């Protein structure tokens, strides 16, 4: 198997591709996280046939990247840059994405969802770095 992205085990739709392309998580890190967390499989299932050392190095990088992302979110909350309104919007977005990402959706519907995500993320980002007088 060439890649997890070609696997029938993953509903690798346009939305997942969009999110992965814009995330701080690499494709390899995503594959590790997905196979371990979602599929419940480890090194023996590695679709890239990586060496054991390379697999566990990538696993460590994945953990470190996820920790950094979580600390970044907590930092933004701590300085009130990510306020309750933004967190509420993100929670709603998370709930919708978790439903949509597990379905087979056509490109037109995916494009609509992606447009909404882009708009909300752009607005939240703008609000986070807005100059307050």
Language-model region placement:
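N-terminal leader segment of winged-helix/HTH proteins
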Residues: 1-7, 76
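C-terminal flanking helix
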Residues: 63-70, 74
